[in-house]
């Protein structure tokens, strides 16, 4: 492993180690209880949210990406999961407020436990929350890289737990995977 790979692995391991245990169970409990799950983010956090949405679909959940032309209206009993490093992304705040006003539950996945979005959330998942310095600027990992990659890692581990708990098989998940590609 070269020094850059070691840097990435070291930083991400630190963030994951400082993310309190049990948030994966809380997320999965809210997903299970929801009628439908809506997922959103902005920028690279949007890309991470798409990974998670796809895996939930593979696991058999009814999931919509916010902002797509075919996304239905959110309603009471639904769940909105939003990924925002700052917890205050201006383009996402109106969506969080709208979802809340419609009676949906809100999960905010962020590097900040306290934020405007957190104030509206039913669950805040503070990735790296036990380390105040987890997201300090790191040369070679610019502009949110640490948050985005550690969030992807955390959510993939959450899916691994879901697959194990529900006894899902790769064959069963693959049968749900898109076949018009």
From Swiss-Prot:
Molecular function per GO: 6-phospho-3-hexuloisomerase activity; carbohydrate derivative binding
Transmembrane segments: none
Cell membrane recorded as keyword: no
Assigned EC number: 5.3.1.27
Pathway info: One-carbon metabolism; formaldehyde assimilation via RuMP pathway; D-fructose 6-phosphate from D-ribulose 5-phosphate and formaldehyde: step 2/2
EC category name: isomerase
Keyword Isomerase tagged: yes
Amino acids binding substrate: 45, 84-89
Domain of life (superkingdom): Bacteria
Keyword field: Carbohydrate metabolism, Isomerase
UniProt catalytic activity: D-arabino-hex-3-ulose 6-phosphate = beta-D-fructose 6-phosphate
GO BP field: carbohydrate derivative metabolic process; formaldehyde assimilation via ribulose monophosphate cycle
Active site, renumbered: 148
Domain annotation SIS: ranges: 27-168
A Pfam family assignment: SIS
Oligomeric and partner information: Homodimer.
Family indicated by similarity: Belongs to the SIS family. PHI subfamily.
Function: Catalyzes the isomerization between 3-hexulose 6-phosphate and fructose 6-phosphate.
Protein name as it appears in the record: 3-hexulose-6-phosphate isomerase
Organism: Methylomonas aminofaciens
Gene responsible for this protein: rmpB
């Amino acid at each position: 492993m070269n020094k850059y790979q070691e840097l990435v692995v070291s930083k991400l391991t630190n963030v994951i180690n400082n993310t309190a245990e049990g948030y994966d169970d809380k997320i999965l409990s809210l997903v299970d209880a929801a009628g439908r799950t809506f997922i959103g983010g902005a920028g690279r956090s949007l890309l991470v949210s798409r990974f998670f949405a796809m895996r939930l679909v593979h696991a058999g959940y009814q999931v919509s990406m916010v902002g797509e032309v075919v996304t239905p209206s959110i309603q009471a009993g639904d769940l909105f999961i939003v990924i925002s490093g700052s917890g205050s992304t201006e383009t996402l705040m109106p969506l969080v407020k709208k979802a809340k006003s419609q009676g949906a539950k809100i999960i905010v996945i962020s590097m900040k436990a306290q934020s405007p979005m957190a104030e509206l959330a039913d669950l805040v998942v503070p990735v790296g929350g036990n380390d105040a310095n987890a997201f300090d600027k790191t040369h070679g990992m610019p502009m949110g890289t640490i948050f985005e990659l550690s969030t992807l890692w955390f959510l993939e581990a959450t899916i691994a737990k879901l697959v194990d708990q529900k006894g899902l098989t790769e064959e069963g998940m693959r049968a749900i995977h898109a076949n018009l590609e």
